[in-house]
Amino acid sequence: MLAFWQKEVGLPYEELLPMGRGLQQHRHGLNGSVLKINHAREPLGAEPRCGYRELWIARAGVAEPKRLVDPDGNVVVLVPPGHEDVSAIGMQLAVRDEAAFHDFYGRALELEPAGPRAYRCGDSRLSFARDPSAVVAGRMTASGYRYITIQVFDVDAEHAGILARGGSEGSAPRTLGSVARISFVRDPDGNWIEISQRASLTGPLPSDVKP
């Protein structure tokens, strides 16, 4: 798996983070973002594919889209910069309900529209298409693309705001040592979205302990 992403896709390896409970996270640079490959010591249970279907990566020197598949069956497409408005990375989603997708990503997450079926989050582009085979996502600890991460400056405020605007909670904010404070929300199809306040970007983290 690591050889595929490092050699065939060409992502630089950044660091290994122990996650506890037999999980290790191999982090790779991804055009200003991070690809997290989480390795489990124990076999993962079977889960249907969630809505995250294809990762698009803008790559200088690529003349036309190049479709690759990793050992777990995840699709990654290398594209020329600017192809279908992807300047860094893009994630293609399969959804059950287009209106619900627009309401969540446009109103609850407050992302900027980037086309009739797309939204922009920083340098990343999230696009979707209705797919009758799409199902509600199950557990996050399963093989395949399982979650995306949005970096923020105040995870508690952002998490509360998303819930107030109709988003569903995946897990409440918690602090991971001195590295990050994170939470999870879920979109209308149950896809997991990590909200992350990383200390290296935002400074010292708040404590879980409330006065």
Language model feature labels by segment:
Residues 1-15, 27-115, 119-171, 175, ...:
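Glyoxalase I/VOC metalloenzyme domain signal
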Residues 20-27:
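Glycine/small-residue-rich interface belts in oligomeric ring/scaffold proteins
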